[in-house]
């Protein structure tokens, strides 16, 4: 009996302890109502290094007969000075034709001073509504009196003034989120395809009848909620947040045309969407606008081959019209006005390119795409909002060109890197042919490095290097140089090695797209760790393979290298008189289990020189996160082999 009693007491005690230690369950609160504990909080308990965190983000969405409304209330905790950037808020929306509108904005800062809660409201006159372009607007405001420890909150109403509109919802942000909740009242007049892109389980996921009046069921009430969501962090070789952030999406697939009608499917095909766009005067109408530039067209027509004409027109447009840094799949000003102003968005610039190619007798076609940051196209979701740019497609003999003249570093003979490994919507307006086409580059992007150096007895490596960059490596090098300037770019080539000094740097073939960018470098490196007896050096120079990008134990996103890549690193190092080779790395090969990546190292001695050859080849550009363990293990071994030292001993 005493044993049974003891067991009973132990069980009760265990339940009591669990009840005492169980983490509190947080939800949303009314505007202005706040727990003192949130004001006194100094860190995020599930992400200690966070600068700010979302305490809660709640949306209540209700569908009506002709419009949808969303009431949103968001509260953020500022944890330190770096988190104060969250106090500047921008809400963008699609305002054309009155499709969307933001109203009833309310915002305030909450502080605690000697246990007294203080509220500082944002002056309504300092809440600005501005036009971004003729299609989009934004609401902007900044919170006053913000300091570490402050809580800021805002609420607003978003109205979608079109039948069946429904906003998507992001559970995850670039700062941690303690609680995120979407409540939706959806009338039975509408049917949506609900697409969850989450890997963390919901804390709440319910469906209940939506009842109005005494017993009138008009639809369903849904709740989706998640708690303690870690901040979204960019991972090496990942596409944009749009592909990887945890969210839920809604696509209207059916609705009733009358109060007592039957539900009809309305999901449009890609062909129907494309056809409607081509027939739209603001889009398709611009394809037939004729831009006058007799000099450009005459010069293009004087060239012998179509290939030369394509190259000339592409570079002329690229170098004449400045991109305003906006990737859009619509036109704001129209091609004639953009050509006059010499500045426009991505689609406007490429429509100008399309126009001139047509005038020069080159058959070409518009093609919608989504850029890397905008997110990959989900082919089963027939929604034009997945696209954010238009490019020009040209077929010349056996070669396909995808031309984007908005980026000044793009070339006519390489597919735009920003569009690789996703599908575009190809359009042939004349034949009413509209189809999805997947874009990938089968040709490897190559980088070839030659190092010729002499090892000095005093522990210094001195010599020259030549780097030949092909395709996307060429484009990336030109972009980095143009963005950083020569001094910072040469620092980049040093890969944070303070013992490496670049004495001179020269470039060749910067203006010729068909030739590799050649970089000639004279350098000197102090071989630290060397002493009176031994010299140690690592031949992994100017390779861009100094730091392993895949050290994390887990991976949340697909690895997308963009292109398949090939690297060849060759070195010849002269051994100083009075020294002998004490230790050389062995010649070895490494291969991924599926043979998608190979690494080969050959090290040998020849006539008093050390010859080093590294070869890295990729057979594919995409690796799913399920393949990450294999990638991580391969890279760990490869970097160990790349960074293995050569040892010389004094005779």
Show the residue positions of the predicted features:
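Active-site neighborhood of thiol-dependent amide/isopeptide-bond enzymes
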Residues: 135, 297-395, 412
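Acidic low-complexity segments
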Residues: 237-323, 331-332
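Beta-strand-rich, non-transmembrane domain signature
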Residues: 20-275, 292, 351-354, 364-517, ...
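Hydrophobic alpha-helix feature that most strongly marks membrane-spanning transmembrane helices
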Residues: 318, 322, 358, 457, ...
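Extended, non-catalytic structural segments that build the interaction scaffolds
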Residues: 297-301, 449-450, 556-561
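Conserved, compact domain cores that house catalytic/ligand-binding motifs in diverse enzymes
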Residues: 283-291, 308, 313, 346, ...
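A carboxyl-terminal module marker
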Residues: 492-651
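Bacterial Sec-dependent N-terminal signal peptides
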Residues: 1-25, 651
């Amino acid at each position: 009996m005493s044993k049974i009693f003891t067991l009973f007491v132990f069980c009760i005690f265990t339940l009591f302890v669990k009840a005492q230690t169980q983490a509190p369950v947080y939800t949303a609160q009314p505007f202005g109502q706040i727990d003192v504990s949130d004001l006194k909080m100094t860190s995020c308990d599930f992400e200690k290094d966070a600068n700010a965190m979302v305490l809660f983000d709640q949306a209540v969405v209700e569908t009506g007969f002709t419009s949808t409304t969303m009431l949103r209330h968001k509260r953020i905790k500022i944890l330190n000075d770096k988190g104060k950037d969250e106090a500047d808020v921008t809400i963008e929306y699609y305002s054309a034709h009155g499709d969307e509108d933001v109203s009833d904005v309310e915002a305030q800062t909450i502080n605690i001073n000697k246990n007294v809660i203080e509220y500082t409201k944002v002056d309504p006159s300092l809440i600005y509504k501005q036009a971004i372009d003729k299609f989009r607007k934004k609401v902007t405001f900044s919170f006053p009196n913000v300091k570490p420890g402050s809580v800021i909150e805002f609420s607003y109403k978003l109205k979608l003034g079109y039948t069946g509109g429904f906003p998507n919802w992001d559970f995850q942000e670039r700062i941690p989120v303690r609680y995120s909740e979407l409540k939706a009242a959806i009338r039975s007049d509408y049917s949506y395809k609900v697409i969850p892109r989450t890997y963390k389980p919901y804390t709440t996921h319910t469906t209940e009848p939506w009842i109005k009046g005494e017993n009138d069921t008009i639809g369903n009430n849904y709740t989706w909620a998640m708690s303690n969501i870690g901040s979204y962090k960019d991972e090496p070789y990942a596409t944009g947040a749009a592909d990887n952030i945890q969210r839920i999406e809604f696509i209207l697939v059916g609705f009733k045309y009358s109060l007592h009608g039957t539900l009809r499917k309305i999901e449009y095909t890609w062909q129907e969407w494309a056809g409607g766009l081509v027939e739209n005067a603001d889009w398709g109408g611009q394809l037939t606008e004729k831009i006058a530039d007799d000099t450009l067209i005459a010069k293009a027509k004087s060239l012998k081959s179509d290939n030369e004409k394509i190259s000339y027109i592409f570079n002329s447009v690229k170098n004449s019209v400045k991109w305003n840094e906006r990737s859009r799949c619509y036109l704001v000003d129209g091609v004639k006005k953009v050509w006059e102003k010499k500045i426009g968005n991505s689609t406007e610039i490429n429509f100008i390119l399309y126009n001139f190619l047509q005038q020069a007798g080159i058959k070409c076609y518009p093609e919608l795409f989504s850029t890397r940051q905008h997110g990959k196209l989900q082919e089963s979701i027939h929604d034009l909002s997945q696209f954010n740019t238009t490019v020009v497609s040209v077929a010349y003999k056996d070669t396909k060109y995808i031309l984007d003249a908005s980026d000044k570093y793009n070339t006519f003979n390489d597919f735009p890197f920003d569009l690789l490994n996703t599908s575009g919507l190809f359009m042939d307006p004349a034949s009413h042919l509209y189809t999805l086409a997947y874009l990938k580059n089968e040709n490897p992007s190559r980088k070839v490095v030659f190092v010729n150096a002499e090892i000095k007895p005093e522990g210094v490596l001195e010599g020259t290097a030549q780097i030949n960059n092909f395709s996307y490596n060429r484009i990336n090098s030109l972009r980095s140089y143009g963005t950083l300037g020569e001094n910072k770019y040469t620092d980049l080539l040093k890969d944070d090695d303070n013992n490496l000094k670049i004495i001179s740097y020269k470039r060749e073939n910067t203006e010729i797209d068909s030739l590799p960018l050649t970089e000639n470098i004279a350098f000197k490196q102090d071989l630290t760790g060397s002493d009176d007896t031994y010299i140690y050096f690592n031949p992994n120079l100017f390779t861009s393979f100094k730091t392993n990008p895949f050290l994390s134990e887990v991976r949340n996103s697909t690895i997308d290298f963009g292109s398949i890549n090939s690297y060849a690193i060759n070195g010849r190092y002269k051994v100083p008189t009075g020294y002998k080779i004490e230790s050389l790395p062995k010649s070895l090969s490494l291969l991924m289990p599926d043979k998608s990546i190979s690494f080969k190292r050959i090290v040998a001695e020849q006539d008093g020189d050390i010859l080093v050859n590294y070869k890295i080849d990729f057979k594919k550009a995409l690796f799913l996160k399920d393949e990450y363990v294999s990638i991580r293990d391969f890279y760990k071994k490869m970097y160990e082999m790349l960074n293995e030292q050569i040892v010389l001993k004094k005779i």
